[in-house]
From Swiss-Prot:
Catalyzed chemical reaction(s): di-trans,octa-cis-undecaprenyl diphosphate + H2O = di-trans,octa-cis-undecaprenyl phosphate + phosphate + H(+)
NCBIfam families in the record: PRK00281.1-2, PRK00281.1-4, undec_PP_bacA
Species per Swiss-Prot/TrEMBL record: Pseudomonas putida (strain ATCC 700007 / DSM 6899 / JCM 31910 / BCRC 17059 / LMG 24140 / F1)
EC numbers: 3.6.1.27
A molecular function GO annotation: undecaprenyl-diphosphatase activity
Protein keywords: Antibiotic resistance, Cell inner membrane, Cell membrane, Cell shape, Cell wall biogenesis/degradation, Hydrolase, Membrane, Peptidoglycan synthesis, Transmembrane, Transmembrane helix
Name the UniProt record assigns to this protein: Undecaprenyl-diphosphatase
Signal peptide (UniProt feature, chain positions): none
């Protein structure tokens, strides 16, 4: 592994780790940065699976106490069973619709106009949701009802559209359906665990021939970098939302969406090589 390849792995690991759980679309950022540093092709597809898995494992580690509490409480704690049921219920729409439509969406919607439009529209909706007066019904994820979980699960499916942002859709959905910022954000993190692990396993199996032993050092470097920066991002976001709204992220989405349109319009980024 030469210096430039190591640099590419670190940069993309940082981008994935920082953007995966912020409501700003990690996909759009990965495409822009990967093109700018010349990291593409089949190796990039396999590499993306690895760094996404690293990011979700960072969340698993960050919330390990809650996970252990739920797992060991399933047999005797009603709140643990309710939480697990809500998580599975919210997860199912993405499974069904993902299997049915993922390939079609990847083929027909993965273009700069779609990504930019999703970023801008999502940013506008985020601003509206933050400024809209709504009654908080749920302050803690343990107090969610099954109806909250199911609605958030369907909202998460919007993230199949490039540029929407999985975390952005679930967090804003949670806010609109009566969750506090903290509860909506934490449930988004928990919902990411089965959703992203499932997606990584599915993609890993589908593209298993792309994984080559010679790429192991590159993958390992990207994995470690993504894990570390994802943990930093998760902790920072939880602290940020304690005293701030999501308005800053909304404006960032809008600006970034316009930036993507500019890169496409002026040919700064070759979107024809993007793989998602």
């Amino acid at each position: 592994m030469d210096f430039w390849t190591a640099f590419q792995a670190i940069i993309l690991g940082v981008v994935e780790g920082l953007t995966e759980f912020l409501p700003i679309s990690s996909t759009g950022h990965q495409i822009i940065v990967a093109d700018l540093i010349g990291f593409g092709g089949e190796r990039a597809m396999a590499f993306n699976i690895i760094i996404q898995l690293a990011a979700i494992l960072a969340v698993v580690w960050e919330f390990r106490s809650k996970i252990f509490e739920v797992v060991f409480g399933l047999t005797h704690q009603p709140k643990a069973r309710r939480f697990t049921g809500n998580l599975l219920l919210a997860f199912m729409p993405a499974v069904v619709l993902g299997v049915l439509f993922a390939d079609l969406i990847h083929e027909y919607l993965f273009n700069p106009v779609t990504v930019a439009a999703a970023l801008v529209v999502g940013g506008v909706i985020m601003l509206w949701a933050e400024r809209r007066k709504h009654r908080v019904e749920v302050d803690h994820v343990d107090d969610m009802r099954w109806s909250h979980a199911l609605k958030i699960g369907f909202i998460q499916c919007l993230a199949m559209i490039p540029g929407t942002s999985r975390s952005g859709s679930t967090i804003i959905g949670g806010l609109l359906f009566g969750l506090s910022r903290k509860a909506a954000t934490e449930f988004s993190f928990f919902l990411a665990m089965p959703t992203m692990v499932g997606a990584a396993v599915y993609s890993g199996y589908k593209y298993r021939d792309l994984f080559q032993p010679g790429d192991l050092p590159v993958f390992a470097l990207g994995f470690v970098t993504s894990f570390i920066f994802a943990m930093i991002a998760v902790r920072a976001l939880l602290k940020f939302i304690a005293n701030h709204s999501y308005a800053a992220f909304a404006w960032y989405r809008i600006v970034f969406g316009l930036f993507i349109l500019a890169t496409w319009q002026f040919g700064w980024v070759d979107w024809s090589t993007a793989h998602g």
